[in-house]
Amino acid sequence: MTRAERKREHINHALSTGQNRETGLDDITFVHVSLPNLALEKVDISTKIGGLTSSSPIFINAMTGGGGQLTYEINRSLARAARKAGMPLAVGSQMSALKDPSERCSYEIVRKENPDGLIFANLGSEADAEQAKMAVDMIQADALQIHLNVIQEIVMPEGDRSFTGALGRIERIAAEAGVPVFVKEVGFGMSRESARQLFDAGAAAVDAGGYGGTNFSKIENMRREKALQFFNTWGISTAASLAEIHSLSADQSIIASGGLQSALDVAKSIALGASGAGMAGTFLKALTSKGEEGLFDEMTALLQELKMIMTALGCQSVSQLQKAPLVIKGDTHHWLSERGIDTSRFSRR
């Protein structure tokens, strides 16, 4: 099977498997504010993500590319909607275009349709610094995502089996790429120990990529003769991942992703420490079911609903929302307690 064929299979399986809604965000409850003293029109949702200023904390996370005409059309529609909504956009892994130049157009269309927007390039941790620079140049990217997908590769029948040297490559890429480097998980979450290593290696931001959204173990298991079912429930939830990473330092740039489906999910993620929130499966489903205009409507509704939530909490800015008090309960509270993370610092601030 070619890379392009595998990319198309991934899209179809992602739509059919959906999201399992085990992000841990249902364990998060905001402390209600009866006197917010704020008008909705005064709310400012601009933010800084890894040193980049964005008018929107929500962005379209990496989905696809390199799968022929289908992925070209998806990326074209995503780029158009992102331009109209003022949202950043990440492309899927560009390794396929580095190996097969005929696939470059499925990525280059993003910059062509969105010449002034924030665009993130994307490669896996197997890439070297020279490939990273080529990926950035391909789409004149403002930042580069490096994705960590060990479990997906292990389950993938034709996937990688050696993961040595990844941190060293990331460190070199961060030093030489010429743009901020964001390192992201792909649905299996991230511990504070892993995040610390990545920040120390020069990552401008880490993306939690928590468990609870699109499940790449399930997707790859659908392609196996003998499924590795034990990996289907493997990982750290989005909520727990965010709290873990935030426990390192309040000054680090954190991105939330992994099953985010609503403005409330985004608001909770920001209050857990994120400065930006990536959504992929939700936007892909909107595009395939409602078309490009329907996707744009969904995006603008999310941004407006986020402003409403911030108004209710009395938070005029994203930085204020990051300090909004919340209570953590259930499995997420249990996980964090066992990991030695004091949840009262969220509820008593």
Swiss-Prot record:
GO terms for cellular component: cytoplasm. Mg(2+) binds at residue 153. Its main location: cytoplasm. One of its GO terms (molecular function) is magnesium ion binding. It catalyses: isopentenyl diphosphate = dimethylallyl diphosphate. Coiled coil: none annotated. It is found in: Cytoplasm. This is Isopentenyl-diphosphate delta-isomerase. It comes from Bacillus velezensis (strain DSM 23117 / BGSC 10A6 / LMG 26770 / FZB42) (Bacillus amyloliquefaciens subsp. plantarum). The gene is fni.
